[in-house]
């Protein structure tokens, strides 16, 4: 991502007048510019698929018991989401502009300082030149901060060693990283590259929004403003609350709730490997998140509103109430 981003930055201009044209120029005139652009855009999607799988794996096997590692991971998730959001603004298409307008506007829900804060971030009274320029600057710097944080993430992981599916100590079974893990990892890397190249070379716009091929126009709002697919679940939670501040809080908490998970671990076992009821609830949570992702991309109309609200309630209920109680129930089943 950093490499493709670097090559894109060589040809991109962060001015409202030329940003859209510069992206078009990259795709049409720069040698393999189209490839670099689509690798970067779809690489972000693959990045998020990996992150979601990584977080899901951590939840399933109780890896969140490594508190420092887990909390830095949550911080990393926020940083990557911020980076992806700002990157989406850079091509300066309709969805770029209106996405930036809608999401930055959410900060105005903060009491007292809200409206001042929004204008400070915009660098004016609307999303404009100043906003685009600073978003480009931040989008360039953040990945390096993320890379550094990922180093710290690993540093703390190495204090304890990694977890395994059984949730038991694996000290007795440790083997050299090379050649064993290096060979094993090649499979995953090849699979990742296969999916990414298939996306980029066969349907590069599959995950994008056609509205972003229309240059940004402050006078014309697109009929359906929605973020990239990897934000849709959070967007659905935001929209399911008919109050601005409430929605913003729910949006932030939908991710921040991950930091609370270690303190809600009531089971006497670490992993879900031998806990069928918790497993069942975990997959219900996954299905719920997929439902939210689907709802986030739908218009705000009758079946979708209520489905989104129910899915949002279920999301918080599962994590905060149902799963901890089920863990206690499983403890009793084993006469512990």
UniProtKB/Swiss-Prot annotation:
GO terms for biological process: mitochondrial electron transport, ubiquinol to cytochrome c. It is found in: Mitochondrion inner membrane. Its cofactor is heme b. A ubiquinone binds at residue 158. Heme b b566 binds at residues 54, 153. One of its GO terms (molecular function) is metal ion binding. The keyword Acetylation does not apply. It comes from the Eukaryota. PANTHER family: CYTOCHROME B. Heme 1 (or BL or b562) is low-potential and absorbs at about 562 nm, and heme 2 (or BH or b566) is high-potential and absorbs at about 566 nm. This is Cytochrome b. It comes from Sorex asper.
């Amino acid at each position: 991502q950093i490499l493709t981003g670097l090559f894109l930055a060589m040809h991109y201009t962060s001015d409202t007048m030329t940003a859209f044209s510069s992206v078009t120029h990259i795709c049409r005139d720069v040698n393999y510019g189209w490839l670099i652009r689509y690798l970067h855009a779809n690489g972000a999607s693959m990045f998020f698929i990996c992150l979601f799988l990584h977080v899901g794996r951590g939840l399933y096997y109780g890896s969140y018991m490594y508190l420092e590692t887990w909390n830095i991971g949550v911080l990393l998730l926020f940083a990557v989401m911020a980076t992806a959001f700002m990157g989406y603004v850079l091509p300066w298409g309709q969805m770029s502009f209106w996405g930036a307008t809608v999401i930055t506007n959410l900060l105005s829900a903060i009491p007292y300082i809200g409206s001042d804060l929004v204008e400070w971030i915009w660098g004016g009274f609307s999303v404009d030149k100043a906003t685009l320029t600073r978003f480009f600057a931040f989008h360039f710097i953040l990945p390096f901060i993320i890379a550094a944080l990922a180093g710290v993430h690993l540093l703390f992981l190495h204090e304890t060693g990694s977890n395994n599916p059984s949730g038991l100590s694996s000290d007795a079974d440790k083997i050299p990283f090379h050649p064993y893990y290096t060979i094993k990892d090649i499979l995953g890397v090849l699979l990742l590259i296969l999916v990414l190249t298939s996306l980029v070379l066969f349907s590069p716009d599959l995950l994008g929004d056609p509205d972003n091929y229309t240059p940004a126009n402050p006078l014309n709002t697109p009929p359906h403003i929605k973020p990239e697919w990897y934000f849709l679940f959070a967007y659905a939670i935001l929209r399911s609350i008919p109050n601005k501040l409430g929605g913003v809080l729910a949006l932030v908490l939908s991710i921040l709730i991950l930091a609370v998970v270690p303190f809600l671990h009531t089971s006497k076992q670490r992993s879900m490997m031998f806990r069928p009821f918790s497993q069942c609830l975990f997959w219900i949570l996954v299905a719920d998140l997929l439902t939210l992702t689907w709802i986030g991309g739908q218009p705000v109309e009758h079946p979708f509103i209520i489905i989104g609200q129910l899915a949002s309630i279920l999301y918080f209920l599962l994590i905060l109430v149902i799963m901890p109680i089920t863990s206690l129930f499983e403890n009793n089943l084993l006469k512990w």
